[in-house]
Structure formats: structure tokens, C-alpha cells
Amino acid sequence: MKLSLHSICIERKYPLLRAIGRAAELGYQGYEIDIGDFGDTGLGLHWPEEYTPEHVAGAAGAAHAAGIEISSLCLGVLWRFYPTSPDAAVRAQATEIIRQSAGLAALAGAKVILLPIGQPEMLTPEQARDSLVDVLRTCVPEAEKAGVIYAVENVGQALARTADNLIEIVSRVDSPACQVYYDVGNATSQGAEVGADMRKLGKRIVMLHVKDFQRTAGRREVAVIGEGAVDWPGVAAACRDIGYDGFLTLEVPGTAETADDVAVRSRDALRRLGI
């Protein structure tokens, strides 16, 4: 399997283009760009400057020069614009963001677009899933045309918390361009049996987020790989059982002071664990 680095790990220390090169220097084969927020620049056609086609092409060029891939795009901006929102205008904005991200991903050479999906408090999980499925059915033709995959992540929200929830969403959308981005750390923090989840999801998993969790003063906190509660031998066994050999994307936040150290320690831990 190949290792990828999510931008949250390193971009507090390095700007995007340098971060991509640094990821390669640290022994990673991929980089996940997080489109985290649009700030005050608007929506839809008004993408922030760093995420315009010209800048995304620059990121792809930096990755090629460094000898790594842009493995995926993460639409972190969806934490602001929920595709499950009861507000039709917000849903429309989220839909347009998701649709347009397909072209950006293709330009970057990324095959996967991570969709972190929140659930508004006033909706039941069933209502939120219905809204999400409607949005994704609208968007998947763009992904199919671009040759990329929208991957719904288990971020801990009730609408997509379990393997069965994720299978329902993917089955209802019914497109090869809609699959699952499984986060082993999030699943562990929610009490899931990760190996069983992964085997149930099987080939629907197109990418994995890897991070660890530990409890500190009663709170769950993200930890370096191997320093928390995740059953890593179980993760490795499940990967073998389902034939997963894609990217493992590290998502352990680093500060300007700790970014390199966190990336190296997590890389080494994953290799020691045989993942």
C-alpha cells in the first residue's frame, strides 16, 4: 500500500506547493489537498484563488516534479455548506461545489474526492441520508464524465456512522462514481469494530484515512499512529482480506513545530505494523 499525507498534517508549516514536495521528502507517495473554506470569496463559480484550475494545475506539476501523486481532494468546505442542509439554497451551493470539484480533481490527477458529510441537528439520520442521496445523484454524472469518484466518509455523524449507513448511501446513489472513504480512527472513536466494518464494505472502500485516538482527561484526541486505541493489526488483516492496496492517507494534525516529526513517526509506525 502507498502512503499519502493530508494537508492538515503539514500545511501549518509549509505552503501548498512546498508541502507537496516535503511530503515526498518525508517518504510519502501521495498528497491530499483539503479545500477547507471559501472564506468571503463566494460560492459556485467563485473558487478561492488557490483552488482555481491554474493553481490546481500548479499543484499537479509540483507533485509530478516531486515524484508523488495528488491522491485525492478533500472538500472540507462542506463542513460550512452541508449538502444535507434543510435550506435549499445551501444545498444548491453544496451541490455546485461537489459538481465542480470533479473537474478540479481530474486536473490534479486525483481519482478520489473525499466528502465529509455533516448532519444538521434538526434532521433525523434518515432525513439527512435522503438529502445526501438526492444531491449525489445530481452530481455523479460529473464524476463519471471526469473519471473520478466521490467518496463518502464516516466522520462520526449519525447519517453515515456505520458500515450499513455507508452501504445504504452508496447503493441508493447506484453509480461506480460514488463509493466510501473509510476512516479507521473515526470508526474506532465511535466504538466500531473496524475489521468487521471493512470486510462488510469490501470493494466499496476506495481510500482509507489513518489516524489514532486516545483518551485524555475523558476526551478523545487524535494521536500519532500506534499511540492510541486503533487495532492496527486488525486493519492490516482487513486490508489483506478485501484486497485493498490503495492509499493510506495520514490525517494527524501537525503544528509548525511538530509537522515533520508527526509525519515521520506515523510513517514509521505504519511500516512497522506491516500496513
Question: Language-model features: where?
Answer:
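N-terminal pre-domain/capping segments
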Residues: 1-107, 137, 175, 203, ...
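A short, acidic, flexible beta-alpha connecting loop/helix-capping segment that sits on the rim
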Residues: 10, 249-262
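A short acidic, helix-capping loop that chelates divalent metal ions and anchors anionic groups
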Residues: 39-45, 79-85, 121-125, 189-190, ...
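Alpha-helix N-cap and loop-to-helix initiation/capping positions
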Residues: 46-55, 85-97, 123-135, 157-161, ...
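Short helix-capping segments at alpha-helix termini
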Residues: 65-68, 142-148, 172-178, 241-244, ...
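Short, small-residue-enriched loops and turns at beta-alpha junctions
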Residues: 80-81, 120-123, 156-160, 186-189, ...
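Active-site groove signature of glycoside hydrolases
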Residues: 107-124, 146, 152
